[in-house]
């Protein structure tokens, strides 16, 4: 019989900082006339023949139902008065570095999750504060006063809960989840709010009767693992407030990937799938060279307007063969809302999740 040890480290003090509508907020800051207006970071569909994808948008735009990864045309249809801005990634990167410098006043134990969010372990910190809430408030204050931007903060004893907390109250929110509050907090949370649960997984969980964290808390972890592989076990742990992944200041290499840029744009889905086969073969060769297998496949697609889509898929088995990787990458491609009119200038396939094989063995 499989055994699942439940080891929960509640001694850490973790903060997750998520910049509020980051790209749009930077544009509003730099152009105050945009304040209070629906701002969409995407090329204007009236100037591109309806092409383009939304990177992000202001909260005023979100009130109309606009969201990231939506087509610019659909965003325009929802809100014709929206102000479309192509965006300036170089500027956003510069501001992101300024935010990180503020983090460094309090701790060097910082893990950047993306350009607009990061985890901070402040268990030991530079100002000798016992309260992580105090540090989170200071960071919010510094970012607002010095950079003219707001962020939401989540505080808890692990990264998963800190991320959940930062999403709980936006914008400019601050939420604390204490160890003795975690189970009750998670029990009420819909499974789609669990970080890492993708759109494809939600209906599968619903079909099995799992709608909330409380449902997962009452589940048989062995049954979840049989249905979802190691991911099912991780879901059970998260629903019970357990996530012992440490904040990593310098991330070790945990993935193998290859990208191709095309001088001649790709339009036809069949052409894109054919290229994914070629790229998957290169990834497979690299994996085998390093004697690695992974259960997470990531597809990266960049349109001609430089809008980039990234989508991942968790597999039950560890993969390293070109056929399996290509099949998974093609499945992901079929799941995205591909805009054939834009043309693709870059494709990438990445495999990660190398620790899964060991974790599976540990449960036997």
Swiss-Prot record:
GO biological process: DNA-templated DNA replication; error-prone translesion synthesis; SOS response
Predominant location: cytoplasm
Pfam families: IMS, IMS_C, IMS_HHH
GO cellular component: cytosol
UmuC domain location: 14-198
UniProt GO MF annotations: damaged DNA binding; DNA-directed DNA polymerase activity; magnesium ion binding
Site residues (Substrate discrimination), renumbered to this chain: 23
EC number(s) recorded for this UniProt protein: 2.7.7.7
Record field: catalytic activity: DNA(n) + a 2'-deoxyribonucleoside 5'-triphosphate = DNA(n+1) + diphosphate
Active-site residue list: 117
Compartment list: Cytoplasm
Names of required cofactors: Mg(2+)
UniProt keyword annotations, A-Z: Cytoplasm, DNA damage, DNA repair, DNA replication, DNA-binding, DNA-directed DNA polymerase, Magnesium, Metal-binding, Mutator protein, Nucleotidyltransferase, Transferase
Binding note for cofactor: Binds 2 magnesium ions per subunit.
Purpose of the protein: Poorly processive, error-prone DNA polymerase involved in untargeted mutagenesis. Copies undamaged DNA at stalled replication forks, which arise in vivo from mismatched or misaligned primer ends. These misaligned primers can be extended by PolIV. Exhibits no 3'-5' exonuclease (proofreading) activity. May be involved in translesional synthesis, in conjunction with the beta clamp from PolIII.
Quaternary structure annotation from Swiss-Prot or TrEMBL: Monomer.
HAMAP family: DNApol_IV
Family listed: Belongs to the DNA polymerase type-Y family.
Protein name: DNA polymerase IV
Organism annotation: Lactococcus lactis subsp. cremoris (strain SK11)
Lineage of the species this protein comes from: Bacteria, Bacillati, Bacillota, Bacilli, Lactobacillales
Gene this chain is encoded by: dinB
């Amino acid at each position: 019989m499989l055994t699942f040890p439940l080891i929960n480290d509640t001694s850490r003090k973790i903060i997750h900082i998520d910049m509020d509508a980051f790209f749009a907020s930077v544009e509003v800051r730099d152009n105050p006339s945009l304040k209070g207006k629906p701002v969409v970071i995407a090329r204007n569909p009236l100037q591109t023949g309806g092409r383009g994808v939304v990177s992000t948008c202001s909260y005023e735009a979100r009130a109309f139902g606009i969201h990231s990864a939506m087509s610019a045309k659909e965003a325009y249809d929802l809100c014709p008065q929206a102000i479309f801005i192509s965006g300036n990634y170089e500027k956003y990167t510069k501001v992101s570095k300024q935010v990180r410098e503020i983090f460094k006043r309090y701790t060097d134990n910082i893990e950047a999750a993306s350009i607009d969010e990061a985890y901070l372990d402040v268990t030991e910190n530079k100002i000798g504060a016992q309260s992580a809430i105090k540090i989170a408030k200071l960071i919010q204050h510094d970012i607002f006063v010095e950079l003219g931007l707001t962020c939401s903060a989540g505080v808890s004893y692990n990264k998963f809960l800190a991320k959940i907390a930062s999403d709980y109250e936006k914008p400019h929110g601050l939420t604390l989840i204490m160890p003795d509050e975690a189970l009750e907090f998670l029990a009420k949370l819909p499974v789609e709010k669990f970080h890492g649960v993708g759109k494809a997984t939600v209906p599968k969980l619903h079909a099995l009767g799992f709608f909330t964290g409380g449902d997962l808390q009452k589940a048989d972890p062995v049954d979840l693992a049989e249905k979802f592989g190691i991911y099912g076990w991780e879901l059970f742990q998260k629903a019970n407030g357990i996530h012992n992944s440490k904040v990593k200041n310098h991330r070790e290499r945990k993935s193998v990937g290859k990208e191709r840029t095309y001088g001649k744009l790709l339009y036809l889905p069949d052409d894109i799938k054919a290229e994914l086969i070629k790229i998957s073969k290169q990834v497979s060769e690299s994996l085998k060279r390093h004697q690695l297998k992974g259960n997470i496949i990531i597809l990266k697609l960049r349109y001609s307007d430089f809008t980039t889509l990234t989508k991942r898929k968790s597999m039950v088995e560890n993969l390293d063969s070109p056929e399996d990787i290509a099949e998974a990458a093609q499945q992901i491609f079929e799941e995205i809302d591909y805009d054939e009119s834009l043309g693709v200038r870059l494709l990438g396939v990445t495999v990660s999740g190398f620790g899964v094989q060991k974790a599976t063995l540990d449960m036997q």
